[in-house]
Amino acid sequence: MNAKEISTRIDVLDYLRGYALMGIILVNIIPLLSVKLPIPSTSDASYLRFLYLFVEGRFYTIFTFLFGVGFYIFISRANAKGKNGYVLFLRRILVLFIFGLVHVQFHPGEALTVYAICGLIILPFYKANKVVNLVFGMVMLLVLSLYAQKMFMVVPLMLLGIAAGQYRLFERISDQWKVTAVFTGGMFVLSVAGLIYQYQHAPFAFGSGGESIETQQFLRIGITIGPIVSAFYIGLMILLLNFPVVRQVLSPLKSYGRMALTNYLSQTILILVAGKVLDLFDHITYLQSLYFCLAIYVIQLTFSAIWLRHFSFGPLEWVWRTMTYFEFPPMRKTRV
């Protein structure tokens, strides 16, 4: 790894993080505001099906996979700078765990504590052969996905992220667009087949009475096929980012992803504060939750873009970095 590679930020990962965050909030807002189940055959019921088919478990999977990629890049770059990447990573996930402990008091379904714990589990795999990480991650994911529990899929997804980092897949996207196109096409076919199968098991009504078993089966199928759909989403985004016009149009998404920690935690703050002030708890419908998320998108995308014009790090990213390296990096950008 040369000096340029050590200091160069991989933009595509920021785009993907921002993309994942935009999907995650659509799901997280439901339990946070106790959104009521919709009446069958309404627009709210249709939106709920849309969430379970195209969002639930898809963007969380992307975010988890990207944690594995970031894990490999972080340690590699730290080692290349002559620092102890393992020690720095342990500090990094300890700080992440602390953030998670605070966050879980307000959002019981939060992911940071899980990521920190699983970060310890994947640490020995940093030096494993990339083929081993790829094969082991795929086999684990295939087997554990049959249990339809998102928690079981975290470690294998992170291992696949490590393998992607070892293969340097995100550092040469313009050179690999043909391979990416074939991969994305294959994932599209599998995704369509899986989604059709899941849709065929969609319940008439969700979550009550005799329909609860059907609902659970519908959800289990969705979680099982989630990694396939997520792989298609990632491949499609990478293909689109090969076009400069797309990169320009989606540039706010890159800023959003660069401040992923700040935006992830502030999503919860915005939802809970607005829920309290506007009395939304148990009074908001599924479609209204979508409109609320759209408003949060505008706020956070705008804030992220403006903030990063003047500062090098997001607010919580700066705290995270400071506590990881035990030094205070300059926050404000230097003007030339």
At which residue positions do the language-model features occur?
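Alpha-helical transmembrane segments and their immediate juxtamembrane cytosolic regions
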Residues: 1-336
